[in-house]
Amino acid sequence: RKTAGKPKN
C-alpha cells in the first residue's frame, strides 16, 4: 500500500 501524503521522490 502506498503511503498517502508523502512526496514521491
UniProtKB/Swiss-Prot annotation:
One of its GO terms (biological process) is photosynthesis. The modification Phosphothreonine is found at T3. The LHC complex consists of chlorophyll a-b binding proteins. It is found in: Plastid, Chloroplast thylakoid membrane. GO terms for cellular component: chloroplast thylakoid membrane; photosystem I; photosystem II. One of its GO terms (molecular function) is metal ion binding. The modification N2-acetylarginine is found at R1. This is Chlorophyll a-b binding protein. Belongs to the light-harvesting chlorophyll a/b-binding (LHC) protein family. Keywords: Acetylation, Chlorophyll, Chloroplast, Chromophore, Magnesium, Membrane, Metal-binding, Phosphoprotein, Photosynthesis, Photosystem I, Photosystem II, Plastid, Thylakoid. It is a multi-pass membrane protein. Binds at least 14 chlorophylls (8 Chl-a and 6 Chl-b) and carotenoids such as lutein and neoxanthin. Photoregulated by reversible phosphorylation of its threonine residues. It comes from the Eukaryota. The N-terminus of the protein extends into the stroma where it is involved with adhesion of granal membranes and post-translational modifications; both are believed to mediate the distribution of excitation energy between photosystems I and II. Its main location: plastid. The light-harvesting complex (LHC) functions as a light receptor, it captures and delivers excitation energy to photosystems with which it is closely associated.
